[in-house]
Amino acid sequence: MSEKRILLGNEAIARGAYEAGVKVSAAYPGTPSTEVSESLVQYDEIYAEWAPNEKVATEVAIGASIAGVRSMCVMKHVGMNVAADPLYTAAYTGVRGGLVLVVADDPGMYSSQNEQDSRMVARAAMVPIVEPSDSAEAKEFMKYAYDLSEKYDTPVILRSTTRLSHSQGLVELEERVEPFDIPYERDMAKYVMMPGNAIKRHVVVEARMKQMAEDANSLPINRVEYNDLSVGFITNGIAYQYVKEAMPQASVLKLGLLNPLPRKLIEEFAARVDKLYIFEELEPVVEEQVKSWGIKKAVGKEIFTVQGEYSANLIRERVLGQVSQVDKAAKVPARPPILCPGCPHRSVYAVLNKLKIHAAGDIGCYTLGAVAPLSVIDTTICMGASISTLHGMEKAKGREYIKNWVAVIGDSTFMHTGINSLMNMVYNQATGTVIILDNSTTGMTGHQDHAATGKTLKGQVVPAINIYGLCRSLGIEHVCEVDAFDQAELERVIKEEVARDAVSVIITKAPCALLKGIKFPNKCRPLPDKCKKCGACLRPGCPALTKNEDGTISIDETMCNGCGLCKQLCKFDAINLVKAGE
């Protein structure tokens, strides 16, 4: 007997993997994809892991596929760049057990450094990509993706977006189907991509895509809804929901398979409607192909933006000419994103700011060190780039140029792609200083474990990678660990290491203030009679502190966790540490 539940899109994707008989999953956390892997933990039949990065995760999934079982890897859109190397070659080798890459794009860049469109990667890699429009489809499309993968001997990408991943919908749960484990047979010509084999496999890939393009015209995930023929929309994913909301009587061609496109189906649809709109978020992937076929009536990015998320109001405004009736937002004080109360990164940045040291930044909570009042991060490119960026600066301008620079990187990001960058500094005789902000978690995406925390995705306790020992093993003589909240020691060590003519690493250690199980026995309490109204305690921007009208400060004890940073900064002993509850 089936059961229905309300699930997030990401939860539905995980459920689809379970019902499809997936046995192995690997991922690196990244919003908006993270909950897919976290939702897999409940299924004992699936081995699920956090890998150090998306390339490794993809290779793990490929290995499981070659062994003959259904497998998957999960990542956000920028993670696809890291996974590109194995993905492009896996398109040539094909699969044994079904292989699906779940990729979550981020229109609007709610938590990302760019707005790239994974459909373009699928075209370049010559692999099919499917995209659901709600939670129910997310589950079903996941199962269908495995059928496509095994039928056409190819990896398949399932694309989600932030709005789909984090929206809820009603999903009918079904039983798991255990697929037959395919016996292993050595096939060097298929799986060993030396040039002679790869040349032949490229021919196979081209033939496969040609066959899929023909079959796409009759696939059930490409659906035509004929209604009012005066206007028609070609759309996909969450954008389909906006079309149905804004113009429910319009005819719609809903594309579930975005590569390859069903040309015959599209041409037939275009011929039957008077006006044709192509409504797709981000890049004109469908539009460019449709127009290349000579369908001149198609209208897309001429009126719809390539930036950000779409909405039903966008259709009402651009197609119907309506003025959207949107209530004006109340005027409230701006609340820019800031580090949490008690965040150890704030303490480190307070010292860097005091010493007027610039930082090459990386991806994580600590990117917030770029904004006022801390204002120490000058660059942020991608995962692991802080170390390489600092190295490039030194090689371009010399040692003197970086004497007031450091690279800052989190523990999880260091494990992701920072190690190679640090190795490069050692190998090529750099002299920069790297600060590893070790808060014992992958903080920004929701406190996931990694190789240096000693715990797996499934909660198994394992030996933790020792970051100090790892850095020393690279041949770095000057590696030190410092309490992230010890302002005096931080200042001393940073001054010493930045002046050193050799690669050095400072590991600042203190757990993320939001980690479960972290105890905060103390609170900070101001002493107004001693306060000199200098504002030194306010400079790091802790949200628990506010300035009173008379120039003294107040500390919100519901927010304060007693990290003691403000107390250390006060030269007049105008802040006390007290036991929580006193």
Segments and roles (model prediction):
Residues 1-135, 163, 226-227, 287, 370-507, 517-518, ...:
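Thiamine diphosphate
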Residues 2-10, 132-339, 344, 348, ...:
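Flexible, low-complexity linker and terminal segments
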Residues 36-39, 62, 83-87, 109-116, ...:
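Short acidic, glycine/serine/threonine-rich loops at helix termini
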Residues 45-52, 93-104, 186-189, 427-440, ...:
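A glycine-rich helix N-cap at a beta->alpha junction
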Residues 106-155, 161, 192, 196, ...:
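Conserved thiamine diphosphate
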